[in-house]
């Protein structure tokens, strides 16, 4: 990736793993679903210790976090070592937080193996785990020493997981107004143009993060669709994937934007939902979502900060009265 400086390399292409270099001894934690790809990386980096973990939200817990820390301490893994993390977004979030806190910080390398992780979790330095009370309530801003998004790892990805990850790329289209990202994405990992498409999506996030690393201003726009999404995930017991939840969150945001005087983006978002084919919305009542929304980490003194799309490439961020949210949610239920 060129022209945007984050202080570490971000490579998005086939064979990106070959460019990775890690100082000191290397430990590897990886999603057990990608063990073959992880072993290739492990051999290239001369890994001395490794641990396989299940993917999914169950790994973003205090229990698993403690397990990894204790395992590193048990083998005496040193501060000058590096942690290589291979997997989807949940593993990258967990692994980055382990690296941020073990011995008060060790180097780590990120090898995202899903479209969602490549476009979202791998770049930006957000690490963390969940609590029973909500998502990402414990964490740290901590950068990797390199991100290596190897498109070869997508070749065995199930189609629904491949498609689901591109919801974040579509979100970046809504934020940037880029017509390529607003169009329907490439249909599969072998499609021509996928590399350029993903590079463009990652570049949008890199540009925002370069302005505002600690999410005190411009970076908050990246939460578009995520307030409802995180509540949906929690209220449904994480039976919905993050990608599905964000897609529904984007539709809710589009309705909110129209209600507050913005451009009508609803048809565009619904077209993306049809392409994605998420599971049917569970018809949760607003009262079931509200406790999780009110605990949202984006909450400020005046209330939860909603990211409101007023047009492709233009958003506002601020609180919205609950009466308005309740009304919009009823419209949302009629559409889904």
Language model features by range: what are they?
Residues 1-82:
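ATP/NTP phosphate-donor binding region
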Residues 55-56, 86-88, 224-225:
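Glycine-rich beta-strand-to-loop/alpha-helix junction loops that act as flexible
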Residues 67-84, 95-110:
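Non-catalytic interfacial helical region
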Residues 90-97, 119, 231:
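Short glycine/serine/threonine-rich phosphate/pyrophosphate-binding segments
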Residues 97-189:
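A glycine/threonine-rich phosphate-anchoring loop and its flanking beta-alpha core
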Residues 167-169, 263-336:
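C-terminal charged capping/lid subdomain of soluble metabolic enzymes
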Residues 183, 187-287:
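Active-site segments that bind and position negatively charged phosphate/pyrophosphate groups
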């Amino acid at each position: 990736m060129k022209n945007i400086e984050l202080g570490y390399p971000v490579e998005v292409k086939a064979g990106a793993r070959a460019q990775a270099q890690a100082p000191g001894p290397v430990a590897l934690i990886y999603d057990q679903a990608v063990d073959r790809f992880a072993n290739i990386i492990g051999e290239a980096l001369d890994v001395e210790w490794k641990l396989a973990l299940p993917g999914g939200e169950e790994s973003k817990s205090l229990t698993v976090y403690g397990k990894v820390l204790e395992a590193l301490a048990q083998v005496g893994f040193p501060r000058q070592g590096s942690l290589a993390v291979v997997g989807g977004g949940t593993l990258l979030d967990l692994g980055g937080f382990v690296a941020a806190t073990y011995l008060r910080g060790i180097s780590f390398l990120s090898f995202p193996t899903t479209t969602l992780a490549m476009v979202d979790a791998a770049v930006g330095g957000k690490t963390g785990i969940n609590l029973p009370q909500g998502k990402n309530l414990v964490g740290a801003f901590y950068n990797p020493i390199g991100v290596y998004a190897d498109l070869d790892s997508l070749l065995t990805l199930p189609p629904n997981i491949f498609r689901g990850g591109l919801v974040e790329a579509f979100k970046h289209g809504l934020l940037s107004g880029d017509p390529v990202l607003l169009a329907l994405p490439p249909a599969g990992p072998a499609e021509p143009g996928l590399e350029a498409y993903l590079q463009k999506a990652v570049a949008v996030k890199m540009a925002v993060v370069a302005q505002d690393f600690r999410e005190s201003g411009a970076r908050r726009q990246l939460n578009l669709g995520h307030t409802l999404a995180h509540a949906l995930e929690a209220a449904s017991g994480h039976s919905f994937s993050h990608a599905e939840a964000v897609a529904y969150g984007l539709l809710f945001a589009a309705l909110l934007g129209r209600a507050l005087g913005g451009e009508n983006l609803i048809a565009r978002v619904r077209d993306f939902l049809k392409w994605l084919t998420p599971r049917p919305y569970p018809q949760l009542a607003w009262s079931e979502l509200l406790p999780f929304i009110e605990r949202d980490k984006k909450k400020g003194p005046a209330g939860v900060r909603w990211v409101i799309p007023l047009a492709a490439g233009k958003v506002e961020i601020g609180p919205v009265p609950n009466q308005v949210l309740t009304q919009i949610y009823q419209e949302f239920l009629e559409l889904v």
